[in-house]
Amino acid sequence: MTNDQLAQSYLKMSNERMKALPLFYQNKAYAVVIREAQEIFELTLKGLLRFTGIDPPKWHDVGEIIKEYSNRFPDEISKEASRIIEISRWLRKERELSFYGDIDYVPTEIYREEDAKRAIEDATYIVQIVIKHFSNIK
């Protein structure tokens, strides 16, 4: 399997997961929206890295890798590197909390509609921009 094939696979999985976000949102499963959006964002960024010949690390927030190699991306993506890094950092921070919570942090009670909207917008943004430049997925 080549980097391009693996990257295409990542984007296909991201695109398929995007279809589930509205269902979770409609059911007010806002914590689930956050968690899924993070996984979509991460998978899409790792696809972006693979498309440019970079083997992505195994950790969840690859924002710093995006920053380091932004000169390898199309201008539209390079210009958005700061925004991409910020979103990646936010979603990574929410990753475990949205799934597991904590003693004083119950995910189903903490996350609100506006959090879910933001996560959906962020996931949509990254999937669209990467697919536009690198994928044969429509």
What are these regions (language model features)?
Residues M1-K138:
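Terminal alpha-helical segments
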